[in-house]
Amino acid sequence: MIAYITIGSNDLPRAKAFYQAILLPLGYDFSEGREGLSFVLPVPEGEQPSAPDVYVKRPFDGAPATAGNGMMVAFQAPTQAEVRDLHGAALAAGGQDGGAPGFRAAYSAGFYVGYLRDPDGNKIALFSSNPDEPSRDD
């Protein structure tokens, strides 16, 4: 299981607005400290996390944060409507559209996904594969 994801940023206030628009509606708790931004899903005592923590901070080496080519972080939403809502909220919070929410021929029929770039250029996917919702084949 992946325990956490760290995303580099050169502009933490812009990154804060972007990631809060996506992660708070998905149930993540937020805190801000000396090192940067922390988004953590609450975990009941005695249980294991169901998704990784997300940290957004300036790179430790002091060099500028750059987006990795081919690297992407995907966040699962419970419904297709939530994917659309989160995609819109992320655009309003400074994200760039990387592909409107919808089905893609290259993926399974029930995989509904939208793509974005955060304010630092990192690629983000928002997806739902809820079997109770329409698929590409419906």
Language model feature labels by segment:
Residues 1, 66-69, 108:
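Short glycine-enriched loop/turn motifs at secondary-structure junctions
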Residues 1-17, 73, 129-138:
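N-terminal beta-strand motif that seeds the catalytic metal site of vicinal oxygen chelate
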Residues 10-14, 74-114, 119:
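Vicinal oxygen chelate
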Residues 7-51:
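Core segments of cupin and vicinal oxygen chelate
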Residues 41-85:
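Long, continuous compositionally biased terminal/linker segments
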Residues 22-30, 36, 52-53, 63, ...:
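Long, contiguous binding/interaction regions
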